[in-house]
């Protein structure tokens, strides 16, 4: 009986001990604050990922739309002759707000500031390709990353080929050469083969994205 009374007295003393309650409340407050902070960090990370995925998706969708709009012309069977329309096709593939800064580069290749803008846009596309593979999940991420990479490479090969065409014209004027002679003089056939290979790559990449409904799968991943 005495032992029970002592226990009760101890309990009463604890209830009267303001330091104990202050410590307990402080501890609980710290735990609650930590939990809220972790929840806020998690929500912030999800929001950041959502924004990155959305921005990336919109840029990719723009590339897909440009290719789709010009698909028939880009995939037409090529004759065994120089591709003199490469500058026009370059303009088709850069005809949106994301790529418009690079479009002028094909008119006067290697001349600044257009050349520098084109280099910057190439780096942005490379970054977009890498980012897409990192922030999206599954095979769709790899598939769309390859499409972006092939898109960038096609623009680069078109740019190189336009430089070659300009050199070929200069060669023809300087040496009063025929078209065939000018082609051989600047090794046009080899450069054309590389460009045609880039056309084939983007065609296959676009087919893979379309056939596997990659854009729809990426869209489903854009959520908080």
Residue ranges and their predicted role:
Residues 34, 38-44, 51, 70-73, ...:
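Transmembrane helix-loop junctions and nearby membrane-interface residues
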Residues 2-51:
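Membrane-embedded hydrophobic alpha-helical segments
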Residues 12-19, 28, 66-79, 104-105, ...:
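Terminal, low-complexity, charged helical segments
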Residues 45-87:
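Amphipathic, membrane-active segments
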Residues 14, 63, 217, 221:
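Residues that form generic nucleotide/phosphate-binding pockets
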Residues 2-9, 91-224:
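An amphipathic alpha-helical interaction surface
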Residues 21-24, 56, 63, 197:
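A generic structural signal for solvent-exposed, polar alpha-helical segments
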